[in-house]
Amino acid sequence: MSAQNTQTGGDKSRRWYSMLKLACLSAGFFLTIASYTVVRELKDSVFMAIIGKEYVPWAKIVSLFILIPAILLYTRLVDVLRRSHLLYFYTIIYGLMGFGFAYFLGHSSIGLPNTDTGPYRLFGWLFYFFIDAFDPFVVCVYWAFANSISSPKEAKNTYGIMIAFSKLGGVASGIMAMLFLSRVIKIPWLVYGDVVNHQFLLVAASFIILSVPLVIQFMMRVVPGYLLHGYEAVYRAEKRRARDVSS
């Protein structure tokens, strides 16, 4: 009888932690897509204001070549970092860089206040490439992390919910940005203007993406380890990598 009660309690505990894991993964993806939705809308507007709309096709072409060394760096990091640490790395880097770009958007000569457009303005190109790489190096890294801690059966049962939350994140951040720009949502101390609007939205998106590693770290600490590995090959590789780092 006691063995049966123990098994029942174990099943309830497993279900609880599985639900907590799903909630954390869904919340993290909600925040990731919420941030991406905001910055994606800033990419072309900032580039056209600084460089010029006629150079947008060139930016798309050059971006493909810029991604090559970034992908090579990613493949190297995959070999030395665990999937969770890789996610922390990219979300923190993007959050901090977002603050830096937000600051320089208001710079009198580098940023938006300078209305002289031209291809020689390096900041506009850097901003475009920075936002363009968000999808492959943040969104895709998040999926890689989720895959590494989810079995195929679990993925089949839970990924639909995660995607639904990501859609909600995109819709919610888009609506909030629209309400802010239309002055429905007003911040008393903020001096409104095109430059400040861009800066505020980028700072908000940066704060959102920086909250993702906090959610994932909470999940990694609370959810038992036996629920945090999926594909066995990936799990064994992660264990070997952890031993190599500790030694």
Report each predicted region and the residues it spans.
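Central cavity-lining transmembrane alpha-helices of secondary-active solute carriers
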Residues: 58-78, 168-175
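Small/hydrophobic positions within alpha-helical transmembrane segments
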Residues: 31, 62, 66, 130, ...
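Intracellular loop-helix junctions on the cytosolic face of multi-pass helical membrane proteins
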Residues: 1-26, 53, 57, 80-85, ...
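Pair of pore-lining "gating" transmembrane helices in MFS-fold secondary transporters
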Residues: 15-46, 126-130
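Helix-to-coil boundary motifs at intracellular loop junctions of multi-pass secondary transporters
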Residues: 46, 50, 80, 145-149
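Intracellular juxtamembrane helix-capping segments at the cytosolic ends
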Residues: 134-151
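A generic, lipid-embedded transmembrane alpha helix
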Residues: 32, 66-67, 93-104
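Transmembrane alpha-helix boundary/hinge residues in polytopic small-molecule transporters
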Residues: 42, 73, 138-141
